[in-house]
Amino acid sequence: MSNLCQEITLPTDPLTHIDGEGEIALCILSAINVGKLKSFDEMEELCDLAVRGLEELIDYQQYPVKAAEASTINRRSLGVGYIGLAHYLAKQGCMYDSPETVKVVHELTESFQYNLLKASNNIAKEKGPCGYFDRTKYAEGILPIDTYKKDVDELVAPEYNYDWETLRTDIRAHGLRHSTLSAQMPSESSSVVSNATNGIEPPRGYLPVQKSKKGPLKQIVPQYNTLKSSYTLLWDMPDNTGYINVVAVMQKFFDQAISGNWSYNPSNYENNEVPVSVMAGDFLNTYKYGWKTSYYQRSERA
């Protein structure tokens, strides 16, 4: 389990001494700027670079606590996610609540997870599987496309563009170098460095302000001049339905979790008050469509 962000869902085991035999979960994170993606032909190389780079960090870094070192070295858990999803959708001409958006996200995330798994499988062929591979569902030949909440099929048909059965066979034969591959972090700060939209979130405006210890930072959304009319702005969304569906389709493929949010603009409701029934409905829909975790429940000032 994680402390603040909610995307990490790794096993832990209590310890009573700093050098005890328990298990402290660590996850090595990275994100791919999908807003820069030109075609799915690039995804294989991008995922391979991300996985190989994080693979080297696991052995390179120092661990002050044995329980963290043993877990990380043996599980080699990675959490690769997205930044720039709003930019990517704007390039496709898709609003978050448009019916075609879930299909676009389905195709993107299938390519993403498939190529992450393929990269880890290739490294396992070179170096061997991770030490605790036999403790994973992957070792049984079980993939995320087998275990997702089937209610997602109401949103988008379970049609695939990649050869999952051959990948399943390769994983059972050679294993994976990493026990997990994907997790969606909030990425508020890292998106700024890459001049990308924040993670999987719709931007708050065309010129959102990122607060930091050194003061506010204004940053215009990518390709503002050409894509202004194609962006979904957070506080213009009438409700959370489209966003909930996007996250649900992503979670179908991710093997860890997603730090998803619920956002409310009080001006959309009578007396500037968000009804409890609306919030309860969002909670139930996230469960129905297979969200594993949620992060913030936030509102715009009325």
Regions found by a protein language model. Give the residues of each.
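Long, C-terminal-biased catalytic regions of enzyme "large/alpha" subunits
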Residues: 1-302
